[in-house]
């Protein structure tokens, strides 16, 4: 719920929900889950442009992650260093630190096979971090995400693609960027 609260623009609720979940995760002895809860709190702080609180939550997430072991429930298998990198990239992107966002988004692509939608998210995250500095590369990476998405009916995936499209708007004069933006428009308007 905390992640969803950030996604719908309610970072204060995201922070409150993440803090409550941290208590439950600690009580259950699930360090990986606790780390994830700190990450979601960090993202809430980033959405509020509170870099100091975001950094504190990122550090808490790292500490909790270092205590995690492999004996967690199967439903936590998705939570690995690639996932942690993706969440960190989100934070830095939302804080406007695009170089660090790109660094962590690149690391997030070292993810477990089989999570196609997650890979598309991470590619979009990298493309959005690169949009200002290297629009050609952002369009290329965004196109890679489009290829993965194919016929996926995912509102969130389309939101990620629209975000990249929006961030590339200043570079519409570049043919590859314009082509990517048109593809995103076609795919997301047809599906939504």
Model-derived features with residue positions:
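Conserved binding/catalytic microenvironments
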Residues: 1-192
């Amino acid at each position: 719920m905390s992640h969803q609260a950030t996604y719908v623009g309610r970072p204060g609720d995201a922070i409150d929900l993440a803090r409550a979940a941290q208590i439950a995760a600690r009580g259950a002895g699930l360090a990986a889950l606790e780390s994830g809860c700190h990450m979601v709190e960090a993202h809430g702080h980033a959405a509020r442009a509170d870099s100091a609180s975001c950094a504190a939550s990122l550090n808490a997430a790292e500490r909790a992650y270092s205590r995690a072991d492999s004996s967690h429930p199967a439903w936590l298998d998705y939570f690995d260093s690639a996932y942690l990198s993706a969440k960190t990239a989100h934070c830095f992107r939302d804080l406007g630190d695009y170089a660090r966002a790109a660094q962590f988004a690149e690391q997030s692509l070292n993810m477990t096979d089989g999570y196609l939608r997650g890979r598309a998210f991470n590619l979009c995250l990298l493309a959005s971090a690169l949009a200002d500095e290297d629009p050609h590369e952002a369009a290329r990476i965004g196109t890679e995400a489009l290829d993965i998405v194919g016929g996926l009916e995912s509102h969130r995936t389309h939101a990620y693609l629209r975000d990249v499209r929006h961030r590339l708007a200043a570079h519409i004069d570049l043919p590859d960027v314009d082509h990517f933006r048109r593809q995103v428009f076609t795919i997301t308007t047809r599906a939504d």
